[in-house]
């Protein structure tokens, strides 16, 4: 599976509208005294999210990490991480695989221009 992810932010006056596909992320910072607080403006579309995992599995995809696919670690779906924590989750994220294929698993559940899925 392949493709790309994207995000766009549209500013009009004091309003912002954000749209995203995949794991592209938008954040905004707010200065509070000497600190800057980051707020997420988008929600990643990845297999870390149970709703996205179930959606792609219902469409016939397989969701597992590379190590799970290769039998190095046992299969599990315990991907319960909060936004941002997945970056520190050991470097082997859950991926979406085409049924019966061992290539190329992608770490996002929605994309633009997925040639393998179109094929």
What is each of the regions a protein language model found here?
Residues 1-119:
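PP2C/PPM-type serine/threonine phosphatase catalytic core
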């Amino acid at each position: 599976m392949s493709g790309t992810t994207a995000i766009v932010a549209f500013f009009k006056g004091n309003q912002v509208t954000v749209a995203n596909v995949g794991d592209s992320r938008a954040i905004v910072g707010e200065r509070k005294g000497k600190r800057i607080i980051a707020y997420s403006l988008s929600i990643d579309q990845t297999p870390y999210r149970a709703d996205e995992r179930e959606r792609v599995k219902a469409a016939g995809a397989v969701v597992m990490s590379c190590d799970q696919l290769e039998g190095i670690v046992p299969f599990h779906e315990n991907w319960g991480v909060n936004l941002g924590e997945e970056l520190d989750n050991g470097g082997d994220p859950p991926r979406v695989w085409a049924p019966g294929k061992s290539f190329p698993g992608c770490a996002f559940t929605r994309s633009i221009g997925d040639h393998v899925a179109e094929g």
